Amino acid sequence: KYILFYLLFCLSVGGWAKDFVHPGILHSSEALRRIAGLVKNDVNPSMGSFNKLKAEPEASYHYCIQGPFRFISRSGEYGYTKSPCEDDFNAAYYNAIMWNITKDRRHADKAMEIIRNYAATLEKIFPMDAPLCAGLQGFILVNAAEMMRYTYVEEHNENGWTYKDTKQTEAMFRNVFLPILSEFYKTKPYTNGNWGIAVTKAQIGISVFLNDTKLYDDALDFFYHGKDNGTLPNYVAETGQIQESGRDQAHCMLGIGCLAEIAEVAWNQGDDLYGALDNRIMKGCEYLSKSNLGYDVPFHVWKDLTGKYSNWQSLGQAGMGEFRAVFELPYNHYVERKKMEMPYTKMVLNRIRPEGAGFTCDNPGFGTLLFYLGKDGERERKGRINENLKENLFGWQFAAASLKLKDDKMMLMSSGISCKKKGIMYDAGSYPYIAIKISHLPKNHNKNWFALSYNVMSAPEFWVFGESDAQIMDGNIYVFSIHGAKSNNGTEFSKRLTNVTLLMDFGETGGEGLDVEWIRSVTDLEF
């Protein structure tokens, strides 16, 4: 009975100590192996995100640390540290990811350099906006530290993670970041919800790094029950409307992205926050996607806990349709893991894939690599054009046109519509025809709307095609023969693999929408 008494005493005082999984904040060991496998196997569309990651200066092992700083802040006396500190923390995180993908120790050493310098130097986070600084920047840094602590150990690497690193880094998070987070939890609500969510994602991440069950439980308790706009029930309504939906869209994307990150950390630790309140995060993501695609969504004037943010009468238009890199994580959980449906988020991803960098330190970004759980996509055949504008607009540039919903279709809407895509590898010798399906063509438009361009003797030349040059199939597929076509300088179009720019210029359309479905190069007219 003494053993039973002892167990009950421990439970009543501190609860059961959690057996934490490591690495286990955003990326478990299994996830890191999966990410490396996506790159090794050249999986599409994940390689698009990887190529974007590699191109970031902060992902290079040549990155020059701009700190470390003793004091950091987002504004005020030490506001000058915001951007360089964010860059440094992103560099630690990106290089930790790159190390786990490439096994190039130079990436590992760069991440270690940044972590060690800040752990030995950083003393305090100053107002204003200290909770955001501690929450957003702290989460990125603790993810980097978690990965390096468990994947670059001293036993196997000369410059690997040491006992001293553990003590110094743990002390930094306990003494610099946690006091800000804890104070926010104790304070009466005074902010929009993204603050509390940012604080919670740092708290749950740091709790894992510190193996601190109480900190972890406090984060989950706040997520469900906190008296703040930044809890799940207070930030996302049953309809999916977000507390900041009437404010603007950037903060909504920040908030939903952070909620998904909190849920992913908990998932790696064996707790399902994704399913909380009947999959409330999914509902918020779908509402956010649907409204930003231009569809009608229900909206009610929100009564927030502070009383300061209860006067937004309609959806905030600032940032509408400007999608951040936060959609892959929730989509891959609900659709790929749980086999549920997120049709509007899928439409968003069809437009923005592959995801690139997050906004500053707000979210990690590169979700098409870091969180992709889908199948390997179709490989493009060398020299073949296959542009599906209904599913992917990556690389397309639009002049004076934007996608808007009309007649339940996403159309290009403007008084003048033109677009182009550079860097398309096209082999006209193998694919002598280009077919373009247009399901809605404005009554008034430029008749010579299709063109190809590439450099001849270092100068651009243009091959322009009119509607009269096309064979029209099935009423709305325009097929152009490229063989023998002459440029503005009389040059015959090359039959070799060529780097071309594809252009469409429909001119003044009187505001009528244009709906281009796809563009394909084909071998013959039987397709």
Stretch-by-stretch model annotation:
Residues E378-A401, F527:
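Extracellular carbohydrate-recognition regions
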Residues Q397-I417:
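Short carbohydrate-recognition loop motifs
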Residues K1-Y6:
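Sec-dependent signal peptide recognition
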Residues M410-T491, R496, D505-S521, L525-E526:
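Extracellular ligand-binding interfaces
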Residues K167-V199, I206, L210-T213, F222-G230:
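Extended amphipathic alpha-helical interaction segments
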Residues S207-V301:
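Long, repeat-rich segments with strong aromatic
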Residues W16-P189, Q243, V265-N268, L273-R381:
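Extracellular glycan-targeting catalytic surfaces
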